[in-house]
C-alpha cells in the first residue's frame, strides 16, 4: 500500500491556474507548494493548506478579509483539482492496479464493505487525511493482541500516538494459523516495545 500511496501523489491531482479578482497563482506555483512546502500534510488535506495560503495572500493584497461566499469560490477551485477525494474510489484504483476486482460502484450511502476491505480502506483514509488522530488519549490498552493483524496494528499506530499496553497470549489465536505478533510489533512501534 505504501508504494501505491507514493504513486498516488502524481495521480490524484490535476493542477490548474487559479485566479480570483485579478490575483493569480499558476499551476506550477501551486504544484511547488503542494510538493515542497506542505509535504508533511496528508495528501487529501494538502490542497486545503495551499488554498489557505492563497486566501491569506489575497486578503493581504486586498487589505480585507474575504467573506464566506468568496472563500467558498476559492475552495471549489482548489478542491476541484483533486481527481477524486472518495477513499473507496481510491481503494478501487489500488485493487485494479494489483489485479483484484473493484468494489461495486454504489453511492456512498449504499456502500457495504466486506470485512477484508475495511482495514485497507481505513489505512488509506488515515494515510491520506488527518482524520481520526486521537491526540487527547494518553494511554491505550489493547487486549487479545494475538487476534490483531499487522495492518490493524499499523492503523492503531497511525491513530494513537500515545503509550500503549498490549496484552495477550500468542498461543490463543482465533486465526486459522498462528502468528507471532511479537515479530512485527517492534517494526511498527520501534524500540519502544517492552516484553513482559
Predicted regions and their residues:
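C-terminal, active-site-flanking charged/polar segments
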Residues: 1-5, 163
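Conserved helicase NTPase catalytic core signature
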Residues: 4-139, 152-153
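Conserved helicase motor core of SF1/SF2 NTP-dependent helicases
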Residues: 100-101, 126-139, 146-196
Amino acid at each position: 500500500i505504501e508504494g501505491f500511496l507514493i504513486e498516488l501523489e502524481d495521480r490524484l491531482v490535476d493542477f490548474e491556474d487559479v485566479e480570483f479578482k485579478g490575483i493569480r497563482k499558476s499551476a506550477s506555483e501551486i504544484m511547488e507548494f503542494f510538493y515542497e512546502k506542505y509535504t508533511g500534510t496528508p495528501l487529501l488535506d494538502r490542497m486545503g493548506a495551499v488554498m489557505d495560503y492563497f486566501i491569506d495572500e489575497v486578503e493581504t493584497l486586498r487589505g480585507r478579509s474575504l467573506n464566506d461566499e468568496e472563500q467558498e469560490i476559492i475552495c471549489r477551485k482548489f478542491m476541484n483539482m483533486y481527481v477524486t477525494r472518495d477513499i473507496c474510489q481510491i481503494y478501487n484504483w489500488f485493487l485494479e492496479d494489483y489485479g483484484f476486482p473493484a468494489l461495486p460502484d454504489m453511492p456512498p450511502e449504499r456502500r457495504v464493505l466486506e470485512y477484508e476491505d475495511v482495514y485497507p480502506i481505513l489505512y488509506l483514509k488515515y494515510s491520506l487525511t488527518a482524520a481520526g488522530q486521537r491526540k487527547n488519549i494518553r494511554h491505550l490498552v489493547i487486549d487479545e493482541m494475538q487476534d490483531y493483524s499487522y495492518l490493524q496494528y499499523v492503523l492503531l499506530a497511525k491513530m494513537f500516538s500515545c503509550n500503549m499496553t498490549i496484552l495477550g497470549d500468542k498461543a490463543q489465536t482465533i486465526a486459522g494459523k498462528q502468528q507471532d505478533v511479537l515479530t512485527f510489533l517492534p517494526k511498527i512501534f520501534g524500540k519502544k516495545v517492552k516484553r513482559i
